């Protein structure tokens, strides 16, 4: 189950939105759809399009395994998803 954003943790909603925005920008630059980002290059679905949408819009906090998957699909180091945030 995806981790919901906790508004009681100072800065968490803003941080989650920034990470989601960064992933969306990289996804669009790469020319991938949300469904393609959530799947492997061979089409095996790891993360549903709805999860990707919720993550990109800051409604859910991505797990470490989700971040690792997205970084791999976007051909960027995992640290690039968080750099400067």
For each predicted feature, which ranges?
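DNA major-groove recognition helix of helix-turn-helix
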Residues: 41, 56, 66, 82
């Amino acid at each position: 189950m995806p981790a919901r954003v906790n508004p009681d943790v100072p800065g968490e909603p803003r941080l989650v939105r920034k990470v989601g925005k960064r992933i969306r920008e990289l996804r669009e630059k790469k020319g991938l759809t949300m469904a393609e980002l959530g799947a492997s290059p061979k089409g095996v679905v790891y993360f549903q399009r709805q999860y990707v949408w919720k993550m990109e819009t800051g409604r859910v906090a991505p797990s470490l395994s989700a971040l690792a998957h997205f970084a791999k699909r976007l051909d960027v180091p995992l640290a690039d998803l968080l750099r400067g945030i």
